[in-house]
C-alpha cells in the first residue's frame, strides 16, 4: 500500500519507519538475487512463475550451498545477535534477532518485541546480502553451537545434520539431474519432495530446491521452523512462499515423463508444506 501511494520503498526517516513494515527486507533480497554476480536469480524465477501463473520454460536456477559457514558472514551474524541481545543473554539475542528477521522477510506477521532504538541499529548495520552471497544454513549452526565459548541454552537440544551428510543423503535419495535430459529436469520441478521426519532448519529441503518447486516439511520446534522459512526467503523462495497447487498441477508432466515425477513423489511425499 505504501509503495502504491508513494511510488517508492519506505525509509527510516518516514513517519512510519521502514522497519515497521512486514517484509521490508524482501525487495533488497530480490534485488540481490537479480544483480549480484554468482548469485542465481531465484527470486526472479519465483516471480516469473507467480505473475503469469505458469512455470517458465527454463529449469530451476541452481544454487550450491557451502559445506560450512563463511567466516566473515558468521562473525557478522554474531555481532548482530549481540546487538539484538541488548544486555541480555546471547540466546535471547539470537531469538530476538530471528524474530526481527522473520518479520523483515515476511515469514512472520508478528512484529518483534525489540525496542525501536535497537531495531534502528539493526536496520543500519545488518547486511543480509552477505548471507545471500555465501549460501549456508547459518542459524542451524548457531542454535546448536552458540556464540564463541559463552553460556548457551539450546533448550530443545537441536543439532542439525552436517551439510555434507545432508548432501550425501540427498544424492542417495533424489534424482541426479546431471544425468537426465533437460525435459526430465523440467518435469521434476512439480515433484513433491519432503523431509517428513523433522525437517529442522531445512537443510535437506534447501538441497532439494535444486530439483523441485514443491517442498514439504514437518518441524515441531517453532524457532527452528522459523529459521527454515528465513532460509527459504533467502535462498529458495518457493519454500517460504509456496507456489499455489493450481500452477504446479497445470504443469504436471504427461506420458512417459510422468514416471520420473511419480518416483520422486512417492519416495518423499508428506501431507502439507512446512508444518508444525
Name these PLM-found stretches:
Residues 255-276:
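SAM/dcSAM-binding transferase cores
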Residues 1-159, 233, 240:
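Non-catalytic, mostly N-terminal accessory regions of nucleic-acid modification and defense proteins
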Amino acid at each position: 500500500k505504501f509503495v502504491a501511494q508513494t511510488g517508492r520503498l519506505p525509509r527510516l526517516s518516514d513517519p512510519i519507519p521502514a522497519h515497521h513494515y512486514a517484509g521490508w527486507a524482501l525487495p533488497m533480497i530480490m534485488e540481490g538475487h537479480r544483480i549480484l554476480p554468482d548469485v542465481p536469480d531465484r527470486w526472479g524465477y519465483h516471480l516469473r512463475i507467480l505473475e503469469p501463473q505458469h512455470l517458465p520454460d527454463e529449469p530451476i536456477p541452481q544454487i550450491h550451498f557451502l559445506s560450512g559457514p563463511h567466516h566473515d558472514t558468521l562473525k557478522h551474524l554474531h555481532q548482530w545477535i549481540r546487538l539484538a541481545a541488548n544486555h541480555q543473554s546471547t540466546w535471547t539475542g539470537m531469538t530476538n534477532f530471528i524474530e526481527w528477521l522473520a518479520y523483515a522477510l515476511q515469514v512472520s506477521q508478528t512484529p518483534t518485541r525489540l525496542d525501536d532504538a535497537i531495531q534502528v541499529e539493526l536496520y543500519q548495520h545488518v547486511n543480509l546480502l552477505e548471507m545471500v552471497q555465501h549460501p549456508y544454513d547459518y542459524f542451524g549452526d548457531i542454535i546448536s553451537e552458540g556464540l564463541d565459548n559463552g553460556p548457551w541454552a539450546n533448550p530443545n537440544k537441536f543439532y542439525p545434520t552436517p551439510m555434507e551428510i545432508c548432501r550425501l543423503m540427498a544424492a542417495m535419495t533424489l534424482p541426479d539431474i546431471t544425468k537426465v535430459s533437460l525435459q526430465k529436469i523440467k518435469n521434476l520441478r512439480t515433484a513433491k519432495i519432503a523431509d517428513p521426519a523433522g525437517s529442522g532448519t531445512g537443510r535437506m529441503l534447501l538441497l532439494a530446491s535444486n530439483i523441485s518447486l514443491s517442498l514439504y516439511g514437518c518441524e515441531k520446534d517453532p524457532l527452528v521452523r522459523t529459521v527454515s522459512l528465513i532460509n527459504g526467503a533467502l535462498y529458495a523462495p518457493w519454500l517460504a512462499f509456496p507456489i499455489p497447487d493450481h500452477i504446479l498441477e497445470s504443469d504436471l508432466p504427461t506420458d512417459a515423463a510422468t514416471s520420473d515425477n511419480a518416483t520422486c513423489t512417492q519416495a518423499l511425499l508428506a501431507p502439507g508444506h512446512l508444518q508444525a
